[in-house]
């Protein structure tokens, strides 16, 4: 809505921006895994929260199509480093018998945030305008980083490999593992369809049904709330 309404981009240009968003997320996820192995999950989580806070503040000053594509790619390349590091951290902050439950609670927290975020975003846009979102996004990222720093204890050492983990010699190359590649392809197809809702559904609500930002945010938030339930 911001790209078409405030920046005046065409639907095709919005598609390219979302592609840059996805590519940045892909790079960030890969880099987050690498950094978690190199420097540990804790600093990776911390800086992948604080740094995007600054980048979101700066994003509001980008006013060109190409500039926004590059900027959103950089933002997501840093922000999505958090995901793999966060999942690695579960081994340090949860017991083996609670690991599955821990992943479930993480997913519940994500969906609860997804239900509150769009609703709050629609309200903020209605009251303060689009540019205020950049400040709110940046501030929440920075606050999340401070929560990690102040309330999440840094482990004395990275969690050791599982006792029953197979030796490296017998681990399969993921690119030669047929069932795993099939699973990845299935995840790709699911994401290919589902993630279009972030770009197309808000425009559909606005252009076809004439809804304003606040009810659009409430409808998108309802989706996350139902998944949470």
Task: Enumerate the language-model features and the residues they cover.
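Pair of pore-lining "gating" transmembrane helices in MFS-fold secondary transporters
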Residues: 1, 5, 177-193
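Short amphipathic helix-loop junctions that connect adjacent transmembrane helices
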Residues: 1-12, 199-214
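Residue-level signature of mid-helix packing/kink "hotspots" within the transmembrane helices
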Residues: 22-26, 30, 114-115, 224-228
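C-terminal ends and interior cores of transmembrane alpha-helices
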Residues: 50-63
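Cytoplasmic helix-loop-helix junction between adjacent transmembrane helices
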Residues: 73-110
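Symmetry-related core transmembrane helices of the 12-TM Major Facilitator Superfamily/SLC fold
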Residues: 134-149
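Juxtamembrane intracellular "pre-TM" segments in multi-pass secondary transporters
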Residues: 154-184
